[in-house]
Structures are given as C-alpha cells and as structure tokens.
C-alpha cells in the first residue's frame, strides 16, 4: 500500500491511498460471501449461487460497496499511521479507482490536530496563597455542616421567609388563558432556590399559610417555549403549608453524628481544623497550577479546528446531563425551568469548550517539548494509587479505563504541569 499526505491550508490535508489489487480482490471475496447469502435465484439454494454466474447476472459492481466496507477502515487506519497524522474528525473519502483485479485508489480529506506555537512556559510568576485556617474559617465550615443536618419543621405561624419550603398550588395564565405546564397542586418550592421564573419566589416572601395571591412575572425573551417567551403571566397561588429549617446545636452527640471518629466537640473541632488545613493547602496548590496553566495557555498560539470544539462540547453536554440527573432533573426539565434552549446552552458552553481544547493542546505540546515519556512503572504506580483511592482491584480499573494510552496521556499532562510548577517563580 502506498500513501501520500498533502498538507493544505490551516489544519486540512489530503491522503491519497493506493491499495494493492490482491487486497481489493480479497475484499471482493468477502463481499460476495456476504451478498450471496441474501440472493434468491431459481435453481440454486440460498447462498449457493456460483460466483461467475452472480457476476454475469448482477455485475461485479454489485459487490463494490460491500467490498469497500471491508477494505476502507483498515486501509484508512494504516494510512493515517504511516502518514504520522492525528485526525480529529471523520474523513471525507472519494473513490478514484475501484475495479476488480486493479488497485483501489482513494483520497481522504482530513482535519488534523493543529500544531501549537508555544510561548513562555518557564519562569512564570505566581502568588503564594495564605493557607492558615482561622477560627472564622472553622466556624463557617461548622455552620455549613450543621445546616446540612437541619430538619424541616412546620411553621404554624409567621410569614414565608428566604430558605423556607412552601407547599403550594398554582394556576398560570397568559392573557387570562391557561397554558400547558402552568398548573400544579401540592408543589414544594424552596424560596431562594431559583427553580422558578425570575421574580416568582420573591413575591411569596411575606405570605402566610392559607393566603391566596396573584403573582405576576414575565417569561424570559429566550424561553424554550416560544409561545410564552417574553410574555407576562399571572399565577394564582395558594399557600398550603410552610416549613422552616431548624438547625441543630453543636454538642458532643451532634459532633459524633457529624464525624463518627470523634467523641466530643473539642475533638471534632481539632480534627476538622486539621482537615480544613489539608484542604486549604491542596486548594492553594491547585490554584497555583491553574494560574500557571492559564499563563502558559495565554502565551501559546494555536488554530483550533471547529471539529475539536464540537467534540468537547458534546463531552461537556454529557457531563452536564449527568450532573443534573443527580439532582433528579433531565435536560427537558432543565430547559423548562431555566428558560434556555439546547442551542443556547451549547452556545453558553462554547467558550469553555474552546478553552479546554486549547489547554489540552498546550500541555501536550509542553510534554512533547520536554520529551516527557511515561514508563510502565509510572502506569503501575498510578494504577495502585487509583486502586487504593477507589477500593477497586487494579484489573477492574484497567478494564474500566480500556485503552491504556488514555492513562498514559493523562500522566504525560500531569508531568507537563509539574514542569510549570518546578520552573515557576514566586511573586
């Protein structure tokens, strides 16, 4: 097989591939074995029609597409490897020559991974963060923990306040006409959660159980339901029940409930302060790395193909869908509550997707410039670390990761970041 790679403008190029005639004939043989099983011809059992008779009746051309399906994937993969390129999108393939007994010639228009022009990445300056844990830090963290242990208690008297959970019925109207999705009974809504249309929750503050109130809001201009976008709506709301959050006091029993490894408030605070110190130190290290990465990326130049941005966008959408699923939502409900469309959500993510791609390309280029290689020892050490972290066997982790190259790429990036840290300067 012969391969010719012609680089074109930007990140485009064309592969011209010539496949030997014997491989073409082997592909035609496979195609015939597949196709003949589907042919019914009087006088022959299904799948038993002789090849010469098949070609005489249907023409050898009837086998070409199936033969290409057998030949092209392996031929294209081998051509990519021989040319030493890294495609980032599906190729546009054109068949130049396909004939029994002759070479197959095809071209593949390919978008390849761009080359990065690195700027300064050594000697970058970074501020050293204060990692001391103050009493104020500790108290805020404890208050947050206690708030998570809060119980909802029915509020018999008093007005609805921020943070209360209100059970309500509502009927929505636009131009005095009910609309789809605008009615609910016994709905629990936390005031201040931002679940509803802007302005809805705020108007419930100050109401009481049994109150009935008209709440007037305006749907966002970019609301997913076009028939409601930008329109004013009136919701007739009835307050059925109000619950407030009752935060427990911190005593020895509560300390043990918050952390089973301690038996008193003092022990809880001591351990918690140590944990916070470790977290703050780790956060400072991460912030330093993020600052150095951001500077290195800012200093680099690269022309990113749209295909790479779109691939990253798809990955980010999957991550987002998984996150909201943990909150009991799906994308359809999210669009309804947020007033966004899928296109608007993707557009809001596009800058981050491009930044992610540029970051990965820049770090990979630094790893290449520094001749960073990952040994089997590096991989084994990381697998052991992951095994301990996740409580899984090394074999299970290998199975979950699939291609070992993915882990090697991750380790290569980590070592590139280590270079940034090692070569940095404190402001």
Curated annotation (Swiss-Prot):
Comment text on domains: Consists of 3 domains; the N-terminus binds the ribosome, the middle domain has PPIase activity, while the C-terminus has intrinsic chaperone activity on its own.
PANTHER family with a match to the protein in the record: TRIGGER FACTOR CHAPERONE AND PEPTIDYL-PROLYL CIS/TRANS ISOMERASE (PTHR30560), TRIGGER FACTOR-LIKE PROTEIN TIG, CHLOROPLASTIC (PTHR30560:SF3)
First-level EC class: isomerase
Catalysed reactions, as listed in the record: [protein]-peptidylproline (omega=180) = [protein]-peptidylproline (omega=0)
Matching PROSITE patterns: FKBP_PPIASE (PS50059)
Gene name in the database record: tig
Cytoplasm is among the record's keywords: yes
EC assignment: 5.2.1.8
Gene Ontology biological process terms from the UniProt entry: 'de novo' cotranslational protein folding; cell division; chaperone-mediated protein folding; protein transport; protein unfolding
Keyword annotations of the record: Cell cycle, Cell division, Chaperone, Cytoplasm, Isomerase, Rotamase
Keyword Thylakoid annotated: no
Annotated disulfide bonds: none
Alphabetized GO MF terms: peptidyl-prolyl cis-trans isomerase activity; protein folding chaperone; ribosome binding
Species per Swiss-Prot/TrEMBL record: Macrococcus caseolyticus (strain JCSC5402) (Macrococcoides caseolyticum)
Recorded superkingdom: Bacteria
HAMAP family: Trigger_factor_Tig (MF_00303)
InterPro entries in the record: PPIase_dom_sf (IPR046357), PPIase_FKBP_dom (IPR001179), Trig_fac (IPR005215), Trigger_fac_C (IPR008880), Trigger_fac_C_sf (IPR037041), Trigger_fac_ribosome-bd_bac (IPR008881), Trigger_fac_ribosome-bd_sf (IPR036611), Trigger_fact/SurA_dom_sf (IPR027304)
Record-given protein name: Trigger factor
Entry's localization field: Cytoplasm
Family of this protein: Belongs to the FKBP-type PPIase family. Tig subfamily.
SUPFAM superfamilies hit by this protein: FKBP-like (SSF54534), Triger factor/SurA peptide-binding domain-like (SSF109998), Trigger factor ribosome-binding domain (SSF102735)
GO CC, any one term: cytoplasm
Function: Involved in protein export. Acts as a chaperone by maintaining the newly synthesized protein in an open conformation. Functions as a peptidyl-prolyl cis-trans isomerase.
